[in-house]
Amino acid sequence: MAVKRSTRLGCNECSEINYLTFKNVKKNPEKLALNKFCSRCRKVVLHKEVKRK
């Protein structure tokens, strides 16, 4: 069975956490980075995986 863990994506410019997604930790051990819309910046910017607390 695949191990999927929830990950949070934070804006690279304003550091706000905007998205929650799931990824397979065994297949993709590196950090996730996606271009997404930030409602605070009001533009499409890079969102990177934020460290879990």
Swiss-Prot record:
GO terms for biological process: translation. SUPFAM superfamilies: Zn-binding ribosomal proteins. One of its GO terms (cellular component) is ribonucleoprotein complex. Transmembrane segments: none annotated. It comes from the Bacteria. Gene3D superfamilies: Ribosomal protein L33. One of its GO terms (molecular function) is structural constituent of ribosome. InterPro entries: Ribosomal_bL33, Ribosomal_bL33_CS, Ribosomal_bL33_sf, Ribosomal_zn-bd. The keyword Ribonucleoprotein applies. Keywords: Ribonucleoprotein, Ribosomal protein. Belongs to the bacterial ribosomal protein bL33 family. This is Large ribosomal subunit protein bL33A. It comes from Mycoplasma genitalium (strain ATCC 33530 / DSM 19775 / NCTC 10195 / G37) (Mycoplasmoides genitalium). The gene is rpmG1.
